[in-house]
Each structure stands twice: as structure tokens, then as C-alpha cells.
Amino acid sequence: YTQHCALCHGADGQGQSSGGKPVFPALWGARSFNWGAGMGDIRNAAGFIKANMPLGLGGTLTDQEAWDVATFMDSHERPQDPRFTGSVQDTRAKFHDSPDSMYGRSVNGRVLGAP
């Protein structure tokens, strides 16, 4: 992430904006995509990253680099899935029951997706 992504998306994944409009999107945190978005699935995110990132240099990362970046990115908190049922476990079972989803997993002592 530091080598290939931070220049545009920020060291803390906050993205960059100009005049109040996003230029490079936040990859995690309150202004990023929510847990229900396709990029919240590591396989989807890795495929997009491999084909399109870094900007203008799509296809230059190895498969492993794309998966590593996607896993790192999806290991951070983001806005709640709009389909949230009131229970992280139930929401994971219904909408994120995949080894490629970090939703509901514990990372650094915090359950991702917990209110």
C-alpha cells in the first residue's frame, strides 16, 4: 500500500479532495465505500486493483500484490452495510458469507462492521 497507493489515496486511506470534491477516493474510514459495496469483497477489490491501479499503470502489480493491497484495504473499518440487520454475525451470514469478506472478522481487537 505504501509503495503503490498512498501517494493518491493517502497514508491513512483518507483519499484526496479538491474544492470539497473527491479527486482520489478514500479506501477506508467514514468517507469510503460501505461494507455492502463490491470492493468490500477481497476478490472483487483485487481484480479491480490488478486491472486499474496504480492510476494509469493498470496491470503492473502482480496478482499477489493486488491481493495484498485488497486485503489490507478491506481490513479497515468503513461505513456500515446498508443491509445491516442489527447483528454483525447475522449480517455476515446473510450477505458476507465468503472467505473473501473481512466483514465480521476481528482485526487488531475490533470486529469489523460492529456499530
What are these regions (language model features)?
Residues 2-6, 11, 64-67, 71-115:
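Flexible coil segments in periplasmic/lumen-exposed cytochrome c-class electron-transfer proteins
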